[in-house]
Amino acid sequence: MHFVAISINHRTADVTLREQVAFRDDALRLAHEDLYETKAILENVILSTCNRTEVYAIVDQVHTGRYYIQRFLARSFGFEVDDIKDMSQVKVGDDAVEHLLRVTSGLDSIVLGETQILGQMRDAFFLAQNTGTTGTIFNHLFKQAITFAKKAHSETDIADNAVSVSYAAVELAKKVFGKLKSKHAVVIGAGEMGELSLLNLLGSGISNVTIVNRTLSKAKILAEKHNVSYDSLSALPSLLETTDIVISSTSAEDYIITNSMVKTISETRKLDSLVLIDIAVPRDIEPGIDAITNIFNYDVDDLKDLVDANLRERQLAAETIAGQIPEEIDSHNEWVNMLGVVPVIRALREKAMNIQAETMESIDRKLPDLSERERKVISKHTKSIINQMLKDPIKQAKELSTDKKSNEKLELFQNIFDIEAEDPREKAKLEKESRAKEILAHRIFSFE
């Protein structure tokens, strides 16, 4: 059995292509089932987000499994198989495990260390699990990846530092006020940057936000979309008298907020702090305003310095997380190798305990007058002999899990003890066939 991961992401395809190979949420369950019907696929999980579509699969043979996954993607989105090959990357074995761990922990994201992907990966796994397309290996591996990502984020704080301008703007406001929940904010501009700023403000806990825009209808649309208030640009001077935070992103020809405007309202505000954050180029806020008492004015250069510093912090955290991945891969491999050992140990124990049971039956026939107490003592001691005899062979069997020739040596081990253990590969195939029948039956029942 082999682990194959095929990924179409921001490194392998531009956004025009990525838009065409994204599964709708309501189509993902059926997509899991369709891929799972392929004989070469033993387990599968499909991850589909705005920046990546990925198929993770346990396959019987790498070449065949890879082809069927690529064919599945091509048929799903109306491409040729060669097109999918050109826009995707293929990872196999340890490389596939590393890729899964990097993606889940945010190391492969456009925004380094972002946490949204962790939730998306968890949802993808749960959907596959509920659909019935995961088995022993993926049920273990995906839980391991999710646990690893959670631990990595909590131990390194990789996602705590802002690396986008709009998010950094809110972080600057926090540096002045601390908690922002009780504050009032004004966002000037109803474009993309204005909406991003609004979302980051709402995400920080602020609920009292006013959208201000030259075109009132645009402000109204954005405000109603996010359940906040709105006003015209002419209302800005009066809003400045009571607001705490202003984020401006209009790129107007003239300054939206001038020195004279702020001087006028500062007399009304007295000692209340006002944070002005200008993320527009050219600037919306006249330079020099921060010379006025309790007025804090930041422009894009200030934000860039913060973003650059935070990005360096994230990169250091990412290096720490990446350094832990080899250990996780080793842990996974040890677990996988034990899958072949456990049935052998189980078969050895079963044979030994059968011998013990047969011995006790023989004793019962030859010594029928034994008391129940005497029988229990004999049974206990024969089991003890069995366990002591098995101790070293079982230890040797477990050590074979890390041996490069483990399959050959486990076969020899079975021959020596005349046992026949269940083949995990055959077990996986049988489990897959059983789950596939259940999925098919569910489809037929749902259709009827």
Curated annotation (Swiss-Prot):
Pathway(s) it belongs to: Porphyrin-containing compound metabolism; protoporphyrin-IX biosynthesis; 5-aminolevulinate from L-glutamyl-tRNA(Glu): step 1/2
Sequence positions that bind substrate: 49-52, 109, 114-116, 120
Site feature location: Important for activity: 99
Keywords assigned by UniProt, alphabetized: NADP, Oxidoreductase, Porphyrin biosynthesis
Signal peptide: none
Domain of life from the UniProt record: Bacteria
CDD domains named in the record: NAD_bind_Glutamyl_tRNA_reduct
InterPro entries: 4pyrrol_synth_GluRdtase, 4pyrrol_synth_GluRdtase_dimer, 4pyrrol_synth_GluRdtase_N, GluRdtase_CS, GluRdtase_dimer_dom_sf, GluRdtase_N_sf, NAD(P)-bd_dom_sf, Shikm_DH/Glu-tRNA_Rdtase
Claim: NADP is one of the keywords in the record: yes
UniProt domain comment: Possesses an unusual extended V-shaped dimeric structure with each monomer consisting of three distinct domains arranged along a curved 'spinal' alpha-helix. The N-terminal catalytic domain specifically recognizes the glutamate moiety of the substrate. The second domain is the NADPH-binding domain, and the third C-terminal domain is responsible for dimerization.
Subunit structure: Homodimer.
Note: During catalysis, the active site Cys acts as a nucleophile attacking the alpha-carbonyl group of tRNA-bound glutamate with the formation of a thioester intermediate between enzyme and glutamate, and the concomitant release of tRNA(Glu). The thioester intermediate is finally reduced by direct hydride transfer from NADPH, to form the product GSA.
Function comment: Catalyzes the NADPH-dependent reduction of glutamyl-tRNA(Glu) to glutamate 1-semialdehyde (GSA).
Name of the protein described by the UniProt record: Glutamyl-tRNA reductase
Species for this entry: Staphylococcus epidermidis (strain ATCC 12228 / FDA PCI 1200)
